[in-house]
Amino acid sequence: MDSKEGVVHSVCTSAASVADKHMLPDLLHGEERKVWGDGGYQGQTEAIQEVAPQAQDMTSRRTKFKNYIDEEAKRKNTTKSKVRAKVEHVFRILKRVFGFDKVRYRGIAKNHHRLCANFALINLYLHRKRLAVLGA
């Protein structure tokens, strides 16, 4: 998702057994300046640098080392979580407005096409006021 415009720029679907970190290169377009991710993307700095050389890795870091809790890392992770939470709004629209709460397995390709169409509609839905002003 683009942080300035607030639009979804890439959609990637996979089987439920595939970890998020394996899909990361497909989600990046190469012009990112910052990549935000949760703990599932930890340690993917090399993958990010391959696709988007200018991007900073802003993924959450581990805060607990043996018996020591790093308070500064914990504070930074809290800030990163607040930034990442803005992306979740798109998934609320996908589920509540467009009714994509339960996915019937129709094949990955068919589900992917359905998700692409829904996210295109979500981009229009999020910018409906701006588009109405431009159309008037």
Roles of regions detected by a PLM:
Residues 29, 33-34, 39-113:
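Helix-centered, glycine/charged polyanion-binding patches within enzymatic domains
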Residues 1-51, 116-122, 136:
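Polybasic low-complexity intrinsically disordered regions
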Residues 113-118, 131:
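Short glycine/proline-enriched turn or capping motifs at secondary-structure junctions
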Residues 130-136:
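A short, flexible helix-boundary coil/loop motif
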